[in-house]
């Protein structure tokens, strides 16, 4: 499968912006804007997979709580879990 990484980055930013909960919108937009241009292609795919996870499980994962879905640990999930969101 041939993936256009630039198009995928645009989709990731869009999907991070329109989540469903304002809190997750803010958190994911801040996180993706910080990292989307410095991650390598493999990590961008991992970020896309992370964005596919529903808000509730993603929030639980961020808080180190038990989730109802399997989230594969990788560089991006570690960055997300360690990310400190600063509300402006």
What do these predicted regions represent?
Residues 2-88:
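Positively charged, polar, low-complexity stretches
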């Amino acid at each position: 499968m041939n993936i256009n990484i630039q198009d995928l980055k645009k989709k990731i930013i869009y999907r991070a912006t329109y989540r469903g909960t304002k809190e997750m919108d803010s958190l994911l937009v801040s996180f993706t804007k910080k990292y989307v241009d410095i991650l390598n292609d493999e990590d961008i795919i991992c970020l896309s997979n992370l964005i596919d996870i529903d808000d509730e499980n993603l929030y639980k994962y961020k808080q180190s709580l038990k989730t109802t879905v399997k989230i594969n640990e990788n560089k991006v999930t570690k960055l997300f879990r360690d990310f400190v969101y600063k509300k402006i």
